[in-house]
C-alpha cells in the first residue's frame, strides 16, 4: 500500500494553475536547425500570456551538417542525454517551471528527462496530447518529435500544441469528473519517483562528469543562476563550473 505524504509539486493546486511561468526550451544537435522555428512559435504563444522563455540548449548550428565546424564553444553539440541533465537541474532548483524539449522522434528526450526525480515528461505529437497530459498527468515537461511527422504545417501544429499546453489551467482532469483521482495519482507518481531514485545531486555525481560539464553551457547557466532556489544544487553546479 502506498502512503501518500505529499508530492514534489501539488498537482492541480491553485498556485500551479494561475502562476506566471518560466519555460525552458531545449533542443539537441540533430534538430537544432529547427530551434528558431520552435522558439518563435513558443514565444508567439506564451509571451502574451506573461510567461518567460529561456532557450537553454542548442541554437541553430553554423552549418546543417553534423560536422565539428557546425558547433562553437557557446553552441556545442548536445545530445538528448545532456537535455535530461539540464531539465533536472532547472526544474528541481526552481529556476524554471516547465520544459519544452524533444529530438528526432521525441522518444530519446522523453526517456532522458524521465530518469530524474522531480521531472514528469509527457510525449506530445499533436495538440490533444498536450492538453490531456496537462489535465490528467499534470507534469512539468513535454517532449515533441521534430523530425518524424514534422512536415508541411509543422509550425502550425507547434503553435496549437503550445496553445493547448499553456492556454488552460492545469490539473483540471479529463473528464472533469476524474479530476480528484487523476490529481491524486499524479501526485503519488511524483512521490514514487523521488522514493525510488537517488537524491539528485548524488545521481548527478554518479554520472560521467564530463557529460555534466558539457551540458552546462552559457545559456543554461544564465537561466540557472537567475532563478535557482536550491543551495545544494547551486553548490554542485558551482563546483562543476569551477572544474571546467
Predicted regions and their residues:
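A short, small-residue-rich loop immediately preceding and capping a beta-strand
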Residues: 95-105, 121
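Short glycine/serine/threonine-rich phosphate/pyrophosphate-binding segments
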Residues: 35, 84, 106-112
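C-terminal binding/interaction regions
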Residues: 24, 31-35, 131-239, 243
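Short Gly/Thr/Asp-enriched flexible loops that form oxyanion-binding sites at enzyme active sites
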Residues: 108-121, 125-129
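Short N-terminal or domain-adjacent regulatory/targeting segments
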Residues: 1-16
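N-terminal beta1-alpha1 ligand-phosphate binding loop
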Residues: 15-45
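Short, structured active-site "lid" loops
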Residues: 70-97
Amino acid at each position: 500500500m502506498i502512503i501518500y505524504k505529499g508530492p514534489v509539486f501539488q498537482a492541480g493546486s491553485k498556485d500551479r494553475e494561475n502562476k506566471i511561468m518560466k519555460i525552458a526550451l531545449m533542443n539537441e544537435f540533430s534538430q537544432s536547425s529547427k530551434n528558431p522555428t520552435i522558439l518563435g512559435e513558443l514565444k508567439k504563444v506564451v509571451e502574451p500570456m506573461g510567461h518567460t522563455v529561456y532557450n537553454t540548449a542548442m541554437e541553430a548550428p553554423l552549418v546543417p551538417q553534423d560536422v565539428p565546424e557546425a558547433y562553437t564553444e557557446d553552441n556545442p553539440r548536445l545530445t538528448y542525454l545532456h537535455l535530461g541533465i539540464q531539465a533536472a537541474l532547472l526544474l528541481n532548483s526552481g529556476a524554471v517551471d516547465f520544459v519544452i524539449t524533444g529530438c528526432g522522434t521525441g522518444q530519446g528526450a522523453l526517456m532522458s528527462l524521465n530518469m530524474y526525480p522531480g521531472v514528469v515528461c509527457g510525449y506530445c505529437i499533436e495538440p490533444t496530447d498536450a492538453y490531456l497530459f496537462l489535465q490528467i498527468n499534470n507534469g512539468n515537461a513535454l517532449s515533441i518529435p521534430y523530425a518524424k511527422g514534422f512536415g508541411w504545417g509543422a509550425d502550425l501544429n507547434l503553435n496549437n500544441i503550445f496553445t493547448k499546453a499553456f492556454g488552460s489551467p492545469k490539473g483540471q482532469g479529463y473528464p472533469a469528473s476524474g479530476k480528484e483521482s487523476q490529481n491524486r495519482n499524479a501526485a503519488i507518481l511524483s512521490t514514487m519517483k523521488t522514493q525510488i531514485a537517488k537524491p539528485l545531486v548524488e545521481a548527478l555525481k554518479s554520472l560521467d562528469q564530463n557529460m555534466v560539464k558539457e551540458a552546462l553551457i552559457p545559456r543554461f547557466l544564465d537561466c540557472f543562476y537567475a532563478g535557482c532556489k536550491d543551495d545544494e544544487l547551486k553548490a554542485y553546479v558551482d563546483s562543476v563550473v569551477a572544474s571546467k
